[in-house]
């Protein structure tokens, strides 16, 4: 099962390591560590993407800040229990990590494919700049009865199309993983 390719959740990205490795957790004696990857957008701005890596893929005691890597893996989520509420934590789970000399234009810089099911009715809205977007929450199944719950944003005509999706509907999504800063607001509470 360890080498089974999970086809419904695939991420490929390349970027520069931007942080040291910090311990996350251990499973059956295997340590997992978090780092951050700076990944360029087409606009040349950069996203800081959290990446989880096994100690079996890389020597986590070394300093690799500034090194370029190519990563293939999955998009994962889990609920972090905080004082009065849960917080959905999103990261890329690296199944393969390869050091590269510099950015290689033949490698997808930031590509994601998800095959899952709609969890909540999509929310269609317009941004303050008038752009149409739809918020979609997708459940992507993985082995052993687990699922990753991944919030997605559809833009433009795709937003109008996605706004009609029904809960339980099967959806295939291709896109990128941009860094998202989510700010909580007081909604009349």
Which residue ranges define each predicted feature?
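Single-stranded nucleic acid-binding surfaces, predominantly the OB-fold ssDNA-binding core
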Residues: 1-189
